[in-house]
Design a protein with these regions (language model features):
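Ribonuclease/tRNase effector modules and their secretory precursors
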Residues: 1-88
Length: 88
């Protein structure tokens, strides 16, 4: 998978949510991850949410879209409710 992100957006995401995009992309390698469509944010383009764990053990939600064979993403830690669903 080829990932891309805006450097400034990456800084903002890390400052706001404490998740770097380098860590966020690790979720795509989690064998237990699950992906759903994000209808609330799929107005101009389809966005998906992947729920998974990074190599450091943090459980993350990564929102992503594919543009020209590259993935653009945003990430945050799972809420307690999301974490419970992921663990089941």
């Amino acid at each position: 998978m080829d990932f891309e992100w805006d450097t400034e957006k990456a800084r903002i995401n890390e400052r706001k949510y404490g998740v770097s995009f380098f860590e966020a992309r690790e979720v795509f390698g989690d064998e237990l991850s699950s992906t759903i469509r994000d209808p609330d944010h799929s107005v101009e383009e389809e966005r998906l949410l992947i729920f998974g764990q990074s190599s450091s053990g943090r459980r993350l939600v990564v929102s992503y879209t594919e543009r020209e064979s590259r993935f653009r993403l945003s990430a945050r830690e799972m809420t307690p409710r999301e974490r419970k669903a992921y663990e089941q």
